[in-house]
């Protein structure tokens, strides 16, 4: 019978370290051709959108989809998993926490493979729900990081975030931008990170903007980057203003953009020197939701957590 997992149960079952393992293994299967990922599709819905994204993971013998309604009244996420061998529905998972964990894990994996050796500082622009898992996952993936500098425009939110994550509060966007690893996790439509602020050797993980009309990075970030990668070129072409606009303007070419799975699998070398500026642009893959959802279900069945439908 299918298993139903709530948000609180997912939080009980999985840690950022668990998510790092599940998502990195997913990248390896993507590189091996064992996973087919379908980009997000959005359908307008009364001032918001219904979004659907899906993947088939032959390594896990699972297919799955994440569906969510993002409307003015709120956003609700759900992941459904199906067995490939028999077609049975195996799980329905409330997926807000799941999504937070897998998004943070992607940045952690990028930092593990692309941050310069001995990186000690992390800067984060944005102090919302997703930003928390960015900090936890990158700290887990890069143990040498011992300093976090955060900034957002809302002072109360910034103070609360810094207390919870033991971070320093920056005074402007520039303060986090000057760290070894720089994460943007905002809902801004206009750039919050300028290339001129970056120090040599920085890794930028741009996790926020996932629409063609929104950008977190200015063109100078792309101009200074020695290596640019994303989670899916196909998906980036449909929803990454941070890549599409600079490419349309001649700053970059799609032939120069790689996928993180190539780095994880050792097919390409991302960082060539300690002074290289490297960019990872993420929009999020359904394949990660399937992978981490599968781990949650495995743990739940082992521990007797969840409700059978």
Model-derived features with residue positions:
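C-terminal helix-to-coil terminal segments
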Residues: 275-309
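Rossmann-fold NAD(P) dinucleotide-binding segment
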Residues: 181, 188-203, 215-219
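Short acidic low-complexity segments
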Residues: 166-180, 193-196
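Rossmann-fold NAD(P)-binding glycine/threonine-rich loop
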Residues: 200, 207-269
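Short helix-loop-beta connector
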Residues: 114-121, 144, 199-200
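NAD(P)-binding Rossmann-fold cofactor-contacting core
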Residues: 140-165
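Glycine-rich Rossmann-fold phosphate-binding loop(s) that bind the pyrophosphate
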Residues: 127-128
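N-terminal ligand-binding/catalytic initiation module
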Residues: 1-100, 108, 115-118, 287-290, ...
């Amino acid at each position: 019978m299918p298993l139903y997992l709530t948000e609180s149960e997912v939080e009980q079952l999985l840690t950022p370290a668990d998510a790092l393992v599940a998502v990195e293994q997913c990248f390896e299967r993507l590189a091996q051709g064992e996973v087919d990922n379908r980009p997000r599709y959005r359908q307008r819905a009364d001032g918001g959108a219904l979004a659907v994204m899906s993947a088939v993971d032959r390594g896990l013998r699972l297919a799955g989809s994440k569906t969510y309604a993002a409307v003015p009244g709120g956003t609700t996420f759900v992941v459904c998993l199906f067995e490939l061998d028999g077609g049975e529905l195996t799980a329905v998972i409330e997926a807000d926490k799941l999504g937070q964990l897998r998004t943070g894990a992607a940045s952690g994996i990028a930092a593990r493979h692309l941050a310069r050796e001995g990186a000690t500082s992390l800067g984060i622009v944005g102090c919302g729900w997703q930003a928390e898992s960015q900090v936890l996952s990158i700290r887990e993936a890069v143990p040498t990081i011992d300093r976090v500098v955060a900034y957002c425009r809302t002072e109360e939110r910034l103070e609360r975030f810094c207390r919870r994550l033991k971070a320093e509060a920056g005074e402007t966007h520039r303060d986090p931008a000057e760290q070894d690893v720089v994460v943007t996790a905002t809902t801004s439509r206009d750039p919050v990170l300028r290339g001129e602020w970056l120090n040599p050797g920085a890794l930028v993980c741009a996790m926020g903007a996932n629409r063609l009309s929104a950008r977190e990075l200015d063109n100078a970030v792309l101009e200074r980057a020695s290596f640019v990668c994303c989670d899916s070129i196909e998906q980036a072409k449909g929803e990454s203003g941070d890549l599409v606009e600079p490419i349309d303007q001649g700053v970059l070419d799609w032939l120069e953009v790689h996928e993180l799975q190539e780095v994880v699998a050792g097919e390409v070398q991302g960082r060539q020197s300690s002074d290289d500026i490297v960019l990872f642009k993420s929009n999020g893959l359904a394949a990660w939701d399937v992978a981490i959802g599968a781990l949650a279900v495995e743990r739940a069945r082992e521990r007797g957590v969840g409700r059978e439908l």
